[in-house]
Amino acid sequence: MIVAKTLLSGDYRRIPVVNNEGKVVHVITITQMVEELYKGISELDPTFLQVQVKDMKHMLSILEKVKDSKLDLFQDTGIIAVNQIAKAIEAFRLIISTHVSAVPIVDSCQKIIGCVSSRHIRAISSNASQVKVLYDETCGEFIKRSDLTVEDISISKTDTLKTVLEKFYANKIHRLWVIENKTIVGAVTVKNLFTEMLEM
C-alpha cells in the first residue's frame, strides 16, 4: 500500500527500491502493481470489485468539443481525443505536451476507433526511419498499421471495477475509455482504480 500511495501522490510511473547502502535494487512499475493486484483478486473485498464505473468517485469526465480546425480535438480537463483524419504526428505531440500516456483516436461522431500511446512513442523512437511516417499518415491509418495497437480499450459505465482490473491486466494498459452510445464520455486510469481501492 505504501508503493500505491507513493505512485498516487505524484506523477510517478516507477518507484525505485533501494537497499541499506542506498543502491537501487529493483524498480516497481504501475504495470507490476496491476499484476500483483490481479494475482490477489480473490482476496480483494467483493464490494469493491462490484462497484460500477458510473459509481466511481474518481473518473475523468465527459468530453467537450474544442474548436481547433487543424486537429478537430475533443477535450476537457482530463481527456483529449484526436480525430482520425489528423496527422499521426499530432497525436504524438499531444501525448508529449500534455504528459498523458495515451490519446484516443475518434471518428467525426466521436466514436473511438483506436488509441495512440506512449508505447507507440517508444517503438518509433527506436526506429528513426518511421518518424517520417508520422507526418504522412493520418491517425486512422497509423493505428490500423501498427502492431502495437490494443483492441480492447473501452468499458461501459455499468462495467465493474473487476472488469476494469481484468482489462488493465490482460492488455497491459493504464487507461480505459468509458463509452456510452458509441462515444467517449470519460476515462478510468490505473491511478483512478488504486485511489478508489484505497478510499474504500
Task: Identify the residue ranges that each predicted region occupies.
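Tandem CBS (Bateman) regulatory domains
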Residues: 30-80, 92-93, 117-169, 190-200
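Helix-loop-beta junctions that constitute the ligand-sensing/allosteric loops
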Residues: 1-20, 24, 76-80, 86-108, ...
